[in-house]
């Protein structure tokens, strides 16, 4: 996906037989989904929403209205994007859009050792996480919290990471007190 496209929402399941669909908005105010102009899908088609009720919309694709349930079903999980330049500029140097993090270097807080590069920002509703691609090709997921990512420096092109410490899990076959729990030790 291009950094010039910003994901604002997704088309959900159809509603009724006349082409209406449920729409999930990733904006703070769902009405903002249409405030920035025409939306696009990943194929580049222009999508216009006509809100009918809370989270329910009629859809027009490239000027053609969706008028039946079958056509609406084919749109399920279609992601809705806008062009980056349609967003207002950030007002404060400490503000940024999550897409601005993609491509930044990820370094450790302790000694600024290079961990890798932010490849993607994931947000599934419970909080964002950064996918960091390491030089060996393996990825690392870090929760995007102030504790785990205390420094975001867009101008310097980096984020500083303080990875969460992993808890010591009990040895398989033993509980926390060291007693045999009936499992087989590997």
UniProtKB/Swiss-Prot annotation:
Keyword field contains DNA damage: no
InterPro entries listed in its UniProt record: PRC_barrel-like_sf, PRC_RimM, RimM, RimM_N, RimM_N_sf, Transl_B-barrel_sf
UniProt feature, compositional bias: Basic and acidic residues: 173-186
Main location: cytoplasm
Top-level taxon of the source organism: Bacteria
Domain PRC barrel residues, every copy: 93-168
GO annotation terms (biological process): ribosomal small subunit biogenesis; rRNA processing
Record-level GO cellular component terms: cytoplasm; ribosome
Entry keyword rRNA processing: yes
Listed Pfam families: PRC_RimM (PF24986), RimM (PF01782)
GO molecular function: ribosome binding
Location in the cell: Cytoplasm
Annotated stretches, region: Disordered: 163-186
Keywords noted in UniProt: Chaperone, Cytoplasm, Ribosome biogenesis, rRNA processing
Domain comment quoted from the record: The PRC barrel domain binds ribosomal protein uS19.
Family: Belongs to the RimM family.
Function comment: An accessory protein needed during the final step in the assembly of 30S ribosomal subunit, possibly for assembly of the head region. Essential for efficient processing of 16S rRNA. May be needed both before and after RbfA during the maturation of 16S rRNA. It has affinity for free ribosomal 30S subunits but not for 70S ribosomes.
Subunit structure: Binds ribosomal protein uS19.
Protein name from the UniProt record: Ribosome maturation factor RimM
Organism, scientific name: Granulibacter bethesdensis (strain ATCC BAA-1260 / CGDNIH1)
Lineage of the species this protein comes from: Bacteria, Pseudomonadati, Pseudomonadota, Alphaproteobacteria, Acetobacterales
């Amino acid at each position: 996906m291009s950094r010039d496209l910003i994901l604002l929402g997704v088309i959900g399941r159809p509603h009724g037989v006349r082409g209406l669909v449920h729409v999930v908005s990733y904006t703070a105010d769902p009405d903002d989904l249409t405030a920035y102009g025409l939306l696009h899908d990943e194929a580049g088609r222009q999508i216009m929403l006509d809100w009918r009720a809370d989270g329910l919309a009629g859809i027009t694709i490239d000027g053609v209205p969706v008028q039946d349930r079958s056509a609406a079903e084919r749109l399920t999980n279609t992601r809705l994007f806008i062009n980056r330049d349609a967003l207002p500029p950030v007002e404060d140097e400490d503000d940024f859009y999550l897409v601005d993090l993609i491509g930044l270097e990820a370094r450790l807080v302790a000694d600024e050792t290079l961990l890798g590069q932010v490849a993607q920002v994931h947000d599934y509703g419970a909080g964002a996480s950064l996918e960091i691609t390491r030089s060996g090709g393996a990825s690392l997921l870090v929760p995007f919290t102030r504790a785990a990512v205390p420094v975001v420096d867009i101008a310097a092109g980096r984020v500083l990471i303080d990875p969460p410490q992993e808890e010591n899990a009990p040895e398989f076959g033993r509980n926390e007190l060291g007693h045999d729990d009936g499992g087989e030790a590997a």
